[in-house]
């Protein structure tokens, strides 16, 4: 079977859909289609695929390879750029405003200390150090499972993976990550995490370019630091790398687990549940520990299998929001919009970024 499929192109000139492809389509044919869609000459194409985005080898000796061999599948998003003849961009420091006040300095210091505190928790866990009660907890070597079905056939955990409900605000991603890192449900870590992300993005304008971010690097850095800006894949990836821990996002709409940091071979992982618009952290209650466990060794597959089961059951019972069909109201001009696509297009045309689900 070689059924037809489509891929999505993202470029500075807009987004395009390339249809009627199949696994036997050659890379050379795809290059021609991309060039036609984006009006970029084939020799000037620079294409990135996957996340984090990695360059796709478009050399002539690969042009006869088919898409199956190359690893391009249905629904893939390709970031298309035009090769630049000028020198690569340099890092642009974040704008700090004129005359930083003592209060701003104190806030920056508080953010840094908070980040160091979370990172120190992870270092203690990684080295087998003790963690105070009330802080984050990791299950390292529990006794054999009394009820194997509770953690999966390959697990060593006597516990059940559960969802911790966090406030449904624009910072639910950061609140969830804060909880799995140190066991606290609060907004204190959100501003700090947004600042970390802005710093990382600002420091690498080549990787985090207009095509990847959907806006200029400087605009993104200002946007992500606003309290009403949502986080997603880019932000999860950056925080995974910053904290040195794999963050597994359990996508219940598609019944899959997206493993951020998998390629870094981190030894520990945490789980977040994503329903299409909202994130909640997952934790495990065990008989051995009064403090819920939120961080797990990557090699312990029992917990991972529980997360897969949660995804499958939630999808079956439709416990997710279809972002292509939900209704939003622009809080700036009261216009009604259907789906994420209309909201993004409205934001691009008007600059409005405050939306409320109806």
Curated annotation (Swiss-Prot):
The keyword Iron-sulfur does not apply. The active site is at 169, 172 (nucleophile), 278, 352. Gene3D superfamilies: 3.90.70.80, Phosphatidylinositol 3-kinase Catalytic Subunit, Chain A, domain 1. Transmembrane segments: none annotated. GO terms for cellular component: cytosol; nucleus. Residues 83-108 are annotated as: Disordered. Signal peptide: none annotated. Residues 166-172 are annotated as: Cys-loop. The keyword Protease applies. Residues 161-285 form the OTU domain. GO terms for biological process: endoplasmic reticulum unfolded protein response; ERAD pathway; protein deubiquitination. Residues 8-94 are annotated as: UBX-like. Residues 89-102 have a biased composition (Polar residues). It comes from the Eukaryota. It catalyses: Thiol-dependent hydrolysis of ester, thioester, amide, peptide and isopeptide bonds formed by the C-terminal Gly of ubiquitin (a 76-residue protein attached to proteins as an intracellular targeting signal). Pfam families: OTU (PF02338), OTU1_UBXL (PF21403), zf-C2H2_OTU1_C (PF24560). Keywords: Hydrolase, Metal-binding, Protease, Thiol protease, Ubl conjugation pathway, Zinc, Zinc-finger. A zinc finger (C2H2-type) spans 328-352. Substrate binds at residue 277. Residues 301-306 are annotated as: S2 site. Residues 5-87 form the Ubiquitin-like domain. Residues 274-278 are annotated as: His-loop. PROSITE patterns: OTU (PS50802), ZINC_FINGER_C2H2_1 (PS00028). Hydrolase that can remove conjugated ubiquitin from proteins and may therefore play an important regulatory role at the level of protein turnover by preventing degradation. This is Ubiquitin thioesterase OTU1. It comes from Drosophila pseudoobscura pseudoobscura.
